[in-house]
């Protein structure tokens, strides 16, 4: 995917994280976009998203949402076991 094809996530859209394993169910690592925000410390746009599945990680922290810089959300992963977008539209 090149820069011209990059789609900014929109509220309500659902994305899979690259760690999604369809064998573990359709909701495994599935997230819904809650909104975009402004990181007042850096001035960068962030993506606010929530898991569609029950996240023990967030529950233990007492949080409801994940937040990532837009650039990281749209980034590509380059690992031995996976090369591709960090998140992809469901």
Please give the residue ranges for each predicted region:
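Mixed-charge, Lys/Arg-rich low-complexity intrinsically disordered regions
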Residues: 1-11
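Intrinsically disordered, low-complexity, charged/polar segments
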Residues: 58-90
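Short beta-strand-centered aromatic/proline hotspots
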Residues: 25-38
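Basic/aromatic-rich interaction segments and small domains that mediate binding to polyanionic partners
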Residues: 35-70
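Short aromatic-glycine motifs in intrinsically disordered, low-complexity regions
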Residues: 10-25
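Residues that flank catalytic or metal-binding motifs in active/ligand-binding sites
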Residues: 11, 29, 45
